[in-house]
Amino acid sequence: MANSNLPRRIIKETQRLLSEPAPGISASPSEDNMRYFNVMILGPTQSPYEGGVFKLELFLPEEYPMAAPKVRFLTKIYHPNIDKLGRICLDILKDKWSPALQIRTVLLSIQALLSAPNPDDPLSENIAKHWKSNEAEAVDTAKEWTRLYASGA
């Protein structure tokens, strides 16, 4: 982790992510940019995403921790709070961000969002409508997309 212009906080958080990974989550910094992380989240058990391996990218802006990390899914996913570009609707990535939060908290919150989709605060209107009108069918579609796009690393 040789990047002397990185704030101590980012170095500490990165060391903790590597030495104490959260269950079902791996996050490793890019070799050429220590503010850019390659993330993998395993689909939570008993969710439509179970068995899936979801790739995400996380970037810490210059203003971090005063500004939230930028995170998006690289793996295609059928979820009311994630759009087709992989952007995530999560309050702590927007107006509820606090400098007290850490990268680890953000990743755990995204993992929790996979367990509990919220069609009442959607980023993808069509998927949210599908989820509200026929949840069982929407869950089946989410399982199918997980099988098609998120199986294997």
Curated annotation (Swiss-Prot):
Partly functionally redundant with UBC36. It comes from the Eukaryota. Interacts with yeast and human Mms2, with the RING domain of RGLG2 and with UEV1A, UEV1B, UEV1C and UEV1D. Catalyzes the synthesis of non-canonical poly-ubiquitin chains that are linked through 'Lys-63'. This type of poly-ubiquitination does not lead to protein degradation by the proteasome. Mediates transcriptional activation of target genes. Required for postreplication repair of UV-damaged DNA and for adapting root developmental programs to suboptimal availability of iron. GO terms for cellular component: mitochondrion; UBC13-MMS2 complex. Ubiquitously expressed at low level. Mainly expressed in the vasculature. Residues 5-151 form the UBC core domain. The keyword DNA damage does not apply. It is an enzyme of class 2 (transferase). Belongs to the ubiquitin-conjugating enzyme family. Keywords: ATP-binding, Nucleotide-binding, Transferase, Ubl conjugation pathway. The gene is UBC35. This is Ubiquitin-conjugating enzyme E2 35. It comes from Arabidopsis thaliana (Mouse-ear cress). CDD domains: UBCc_UBE2N. Pathway: Protein modification; protein ubiquitination. SMART domains: UBCc. Pfam families: UQ_con. Signal peptide: none annotated. It catalyses: S-ubiquitinyl-[E1 ubiquitin-activating enzyme]-L-cysteine + [E2 ubiquitin-conjugating enzyme]-L-cysteine = [E1 ubiquitin-activating enzyme]-L-cysteine + S-ubiquitinyl-[E2 ubiquitin-conjugating enzyme]-L-cysteine. The keyword Cell cycle does not apply. Induction: Not induced by salt, abscisic acid, mannitol, H(2)O(2), low temperature, MMS or iron. Disruption phenotype: No visible phenotype under normal growth conditions or in phosphate-deficient plants. Unable to form branched root hairs in response to iron-deficient conditions. Its EC number is 2.3.2.23. One of its GO terms (molecular function) is ubiquitin-protein transferase activity. The active site is at C89 (glycyl thioester intermediate).
